[in-house]
């Protein structure tokens, strides 16, 4: 017989998250006008304070040295399942996409300077970010087909291209952007690199919010025209954008 029950320590955390959602998050969310952005923001800020200072439920996926709970994949699965029962649940725990994945990526790939400038605000909940990889013409789930191109110009990179379904782009303080930097790589998976793009920036143009079956939820189409990014903002090594992207999108 296979026992699918959680270890007791994971079950304790799951129940803790469930109680928070039932006692605080769901009632607060249902009590406001959810179409009123100001009410939504105030509610999330208040609940985040409770999560962090009273409940001990903050950054469940990040290590303790970054203010997190240091949970592994099994515990995170339990936490995510409970938090997702209320639409703002992951936001309240500072464990929402796309920031959660970007936090992992910056932690693993970032230089000390990049971590302090970009990861620290994400962990403190004072900034949001986005991940810009998907393109409308060719590169959806296959990043070897990315056409957005970056070329070196002194101590900067100049980037041109077209992205869409970039979740969280509107209001983000920075983007992790995947662009092609190699015209003739040895293998297709070595063509791309990743850049940290400060936002807003000249050359980063939000065209529209691409609606899904449930409406518009800040999944943006982006035109990128002569966008200049400092060379110091390359995340990981040149040609490692595919590897970084796979790490970013993994569990």
Task: Give residue spans per PLM region.
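Short Ser/Thr-interspersed hydrophobic loop/turn segments at strand-loop and sheet-helix junctions
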Residues: 56, 79-84, 178-180, 197-202, ...
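Short glycine/proline-enriched turns and hinge-like loops at secondary-structure junctions
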Residues: 71-72, 141-144, 168-173, 187-191, ...
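Glycine-rich beta->alpha junctions and the first turn(s) of the following alpha-helix
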Residues: 4-6, 194, 204-251
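A structural signal for short hydrophobic beta-strand segments in well-ordered beta-sheet cores
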Residues: 148-151
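A short core secondary-structure module
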Residues: 160-207
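N-terminal glycine-rich flavin-associated loop
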Residues: 93-113, 142
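Amphipathic, small/basic residue-rich leader segments at the start of a protein or domain
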Residues: 1-96, 113-128
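A short, Trp-centered hydrophobic/proline-enriched beta-strand micro-motif
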Residues: 125-134, 178
């Amino acid at each position: 017989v296979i026992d699918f029950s959680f270890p007791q320590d994971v079950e304790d955390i799951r129940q803790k998250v469930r109680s928070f959602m039932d006692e605080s998050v769901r009632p607060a969310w249902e009590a406001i006008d959810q179409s009123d952005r100001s009410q939504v923001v105030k509610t999330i800020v208040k609940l985040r304070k409770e999560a962090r200072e009273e409940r001990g439920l903050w950054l469940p996926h990040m290590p303790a040295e970054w203010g997190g709970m240091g949970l592994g994949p099994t515990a995170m699965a339990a936490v995510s399942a409970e938090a997702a029962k209320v639409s703002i649940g992951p936001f309240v725990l500072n464990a929402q996409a796309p920031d959660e994945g970007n936090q992992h990526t910056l932690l693993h790939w970032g230089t000390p300077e990049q971590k302090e400038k970009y990861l620290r605000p994400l962990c403190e909940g004072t900034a949001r970010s986005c991940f810009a990889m998907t393109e409308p013409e060719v590169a959806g789930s296959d990043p070897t087909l990315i056409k957005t191109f970056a070329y070196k110009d002194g101590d900067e990179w100049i980037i041109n291209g077209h992205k869409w379904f970039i979740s969280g782009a509107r209001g983000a303080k920075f983007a992790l952007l995947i662009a092609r930097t190699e015209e003739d790589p040895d293998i297709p998976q070595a063509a791309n690199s990743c850049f940290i793009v400060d936002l807003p920036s000249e050359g980063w143009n939000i065209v529209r919010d691409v609606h899904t079956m449930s409406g518009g939820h800040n999944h943006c189409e982006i035109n990128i025209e002569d966008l200049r990014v400092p060379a110091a903002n390359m995340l990981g090594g040149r040609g490692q954008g595919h590897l970084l992207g796979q790490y970013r999108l993994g569990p």
